[in-house]
Structures are given as C-alpha cells and as structure tokens.
C-alpha cells in the first residue's frame, strides 16, 4: 500500500498482467509500464473498461509484488533490452524460496530439547508468521494447513520434520517434487555428507 506521500497508484479501471497465481488478463495490452510494473497508464484513452480488479489489486493500490512471480508478469510484457536490478522487491517465487530457507534453518537450530516456554513461543511464532506473510493467498493456504496439522515443537527433530512435511504439501500443490525429509539436517544444518559444503 502506498504511503500517504506517494502517488495514488494506478488509474481507475486499470488491470495488470501479473495477477495472483500468474493468471493473464486480456485487458493488459493497452497498459504502459516500466520493467517492474510501476506507473501503469493507458496508451489510449478509449480503452475498453476493465472488469473489477482481483483482491489485492484494487484501485489506488500498488500491485502486490509478493503475490505473483516476476517471470509470469514478464511473459506478458513486450520484449525489452533492460537489465533488471538485483535490489528490487522480491517476487512470489523469491520470497517463497527465501522464506522456506529461513524457516528450515530456524528449525535446524531450534533446541534439541526445548523448554515448555520455547515450545509455546515457536508454535506461536508459526501462527503469527502465517497471519503476516506478505502473499495473502499463500498465507491463507499455510493457515489452513497449520489448522489441519499443528506445529510439533516438542523437539528439534519433531519441528524440523513437521516443517518438512508442510513444505512438501506445498510443493505437491505447486507440482514440485518432494524433498526427502530424512535429509533435513544435511540440507539445513550440517551440510551434505559428501563434504561439498565444507
């Protein structure tokens, strides 16, 4: 959401090609934007009226960068000879990868035998985290999964395995392969047994 001192965002009725889930709108051909989707405006004033914007892309709001992957958005744009900056806000895929890396590393360094207070704090952290995750569609999905399978914070191993199973559920939903949960410590704490991380 734009700060009060920032421009209002996009003109009324504008639609974007970087919709949640990578959906494509037929209404995007008349928009002019920069390489990151900023400054959308119509090429011509007589463009047809757009359907209501999906949740998160309403009038006056900047598009949710964390809600869509950059590649999906770029496929809908004209070919450009622009080198993209590396210090731009993360897209949905980058945010997801970095979030899972953080969570798995957090679980890998969780105490082997946590105190009751640590167990409660970690379970609470996971619940709060799922409420504030920037991609609302993703956050809602994680909350539903957590409701079905509460975080097991009783030990480091239990928590790491619970998180790996949760991640594999999401991977299956996205058509990605499962990770072998017996190897979480190799991946996130100790390094691969072949010594390639030493």
From Swiss-Prot:
It is an enzyme of class 1 (oxidoreductase). GO terms for molecular function: flavin adenine dinucleotide binding; flavin-dependent sulfhydryl oxidase activity; growth factor activity; protein-disulfide reductase activity. Its cofactor is FAD. SUPFAM superfamilies: FAD-dependent thiol oxidase. Residues 1-59 are annotated as: Disordered. GO terms for biological process: cellular response to actinomycin D; cellular response to lipopolysaccharide; cellular response to toxic substance; cellular response to tumor necrosis factor; liver development; liver regeneration; mitochondrial disulfide relay system; negative regulation of apoptotic process. Its EC number is 1.8.3.2. The keyword Disulfide bond applies. Keywords: Disulfide bond, FAD, Flavoprotein, Growth factor, Mitochondrion, Oxidoreductase. Disulfide bonds join 135-138, 164-181. Pfam families: Evr1_Alr (PF04777). Residues 88-188 form the ERV/ALR sulfhydryl oxidase domain. It is found in: Mitochondrion intermembrane space; Mitochondrion. FAD binds at residues 92-100, 104, 133, 164-176, 187-188. InterPro entries: ALR/ERV, ERV/ALR_sulphydryl_oxid_sf, ERV/ALR_sulphydryl_oxidase. It catalyses: 2 R'C(R)SH + O2 = R'C(R)S-S(R)CR' + H2O2. Transmembrane segments: none annotated. One of its GO terms (cellular component) is mitochondrion. FAD-dependent sulfhydryl oxidase that regenerates the redox-active disulfide bonds in CHCHD4/MIA40, a chaperone essential for disulfide bond formation and protein folding in the mitochondrial intermembrane space. The reduced form of CHCHD4/MIA40 forms a transient intermolecular disulfide bridge with GFER/ERV1, resulting in regeneration of the essential disulfide bonds in CHCHD4/MIA40, while GFER/ERV1 becomes re-oxidized by donating electrons to cytochrome c or molecular oxygen. May have a function in liver regeneration and spermatogenesis. Homodimer; disulfide-linked. Interacts with CHCHD4/MIA40. This is FAD-linked sulfhydryl oxidase ALR. It comes from Rattus norvegicus. The lineage of its organism: Eukaryota, Metazoa, Chordata, Craniata, Vertebrata.
């Amino acid at each position: 959401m734009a700060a009060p001192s920032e421009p209002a965002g996009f003109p009324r009725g504008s639609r974007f090609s970087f919709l949640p889930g990578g959906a494509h709108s037929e209404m995007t051909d008349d928009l002019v934007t920069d390489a990151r989707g900023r400054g959308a405006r119509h090429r011509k004033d007589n463009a047809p009226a757009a359907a209501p914007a999906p949740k998160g892309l309403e009038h006056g709001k900047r598009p949710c960068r964390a809600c869509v992957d950059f590649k999906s958005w770029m496929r809908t744009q004209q070919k450009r000879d622009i080198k993209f900056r590396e210090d731009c806000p993360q897209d949905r895929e980058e945010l997801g990868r970095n979030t899972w890396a953080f969570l798995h590393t957090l679980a890998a360094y969780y105490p082997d035998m946590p105190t009751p207070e640590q167990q409660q704090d970690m379970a609470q952290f996971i619940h709060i985290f799922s409420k504030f995750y920037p991609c609302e569609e993703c956050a809602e999905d994680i909350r539903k999964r957590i409701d079905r399978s509460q975080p097991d914070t009783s030990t480091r191993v239990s928590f790491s395995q619970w998180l790996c199973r949760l991640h594999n559920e999401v991977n299956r939903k996205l058509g990605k392969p499962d990770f072998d949960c017996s190897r979480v410590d190799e991946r996130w704490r100790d390094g691969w047994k072949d010594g390639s991380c030493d």
